[in-house]
Amino acid sequence: MNMNATLLGQAIAFALFVWFCMKYVWPPIMEAIEERQKKIADGLSAAERAAKDLDLAQANASDQLKEAKRAATEIIEQANKRKGQILDEAREEALTERQNILTQGEAELETERNRARDELRKQVATLAVIGAEKILERSINLEAQKDILDNITAKL
């Protein structure tokens, strides 16, 4: 019977130990396990969200990159068009300036030609009067000389 009392004592001690563990030890362990499971589940869902966010961000980045390339291409095309316009305007302006310079040069040349022609006429008239004076060996008065020069100039 000794053995039975010992066995019964051990069974009671074991039952008290189990009750004590279930009352005070088991709940914090279960709470820690549940908290750990929750953290793991939250981590997995966060990883899934992060993966989805990454995919979305990559898609957005790809779209933005495409949009940026399109915008850059459009800007380059506009710049090329503007370059062509500027070159055309500069070409037209240069041609207009060239024409103005040529017209001005021709006008100056014509003016200079007329001035030289008038100067030559005066010199020829003066030489003719001097020659005529020498031929006639007489001096013509200044008023008569002026009239003769004007007549000769007008005829030339």
Swiss-Prot record:
Q: Which InterPro entries match?
A: ATP_synth_B-like_membr_sf, ATP_synth_b/b'su_bac/chlpt, ATP_synth_F0_bsu_bac, ATP_synthase_B_chain
Q: Which NCBIfam families match?
A: ATP_synt_b, PRK05759.1-2, PRK05759.1-4
Q: What is its main location?
A: membrane
Q: Which organism is it from?
A: Aliivibrio salmonicida (strain LFI1238) (Vibrio salmonicida (strain LFI1238))
Q: Where in the cell is it found?
A: Cell inner membrane
Q: Would the keyword Protein transport be found if you checked this record's keyword annotation?
A: no
What is the name attached to this protein's record? ATP synthase subunit b
| Subunit structure of this chain's protein | F-type ATPases have 2 components, F(1) - the catalytic core - and F(0) - the membrane proton channel. F(1) has five subunits: alpha(3), beta(3), gamma(1), delta(1), epsilon(1). F(0) has three main subunits: a(1), b(2) and c(10-14). The alpha and beta chains form an alternating ring which encloses part of the gamma chain. F(1) is attached to F(0) by a central stalk formed by the gamma and epsilon chains, while a peripheral stalk is formed by the delta and b chains.
Q: Which GO terms describe its molecular function?
A: proton-transporting ATP synthase activity, rotational mechanism; proton-transporting ATPase activity, rotational mechanism
Coiled-coil spans in chain: none
TM ranges are 7-29
Q: Which family does it belong to?
A: Belongs to the ATPase B chain family.
**What role does it play?**
F(1)F(0) ATP synthase produces ATP from ADP in the presence of a proton or sodium gradient. F-type ATPases consist of two structural domains, F(1) containing the extramembraneous catalytic core and F(0) containing the membrane proton channel, linked together by a central stalk and a peripheral stalk. During catalysis, ATP synthesis in the catalytic domain of F(1) is coupled via a rotary mechanism of the central stalk subunits to proton translocation. Component of the F(0) channel, it forms part of the peripheral stalk, linking F(1) to F(0).
Name the UniProt key words of this record, in alphabetical order: ATP synthesis, Cell inner membrane, Cell membrane, CF(0), Hydrogen ion transport, Ion transport, Membrane, Transmembrane, Transmembrane helix, Transport
Keyword Repressor on entry:
no
Disulfide cross-links: none
Pfam families linked: ATP-synt_B (PF00430)
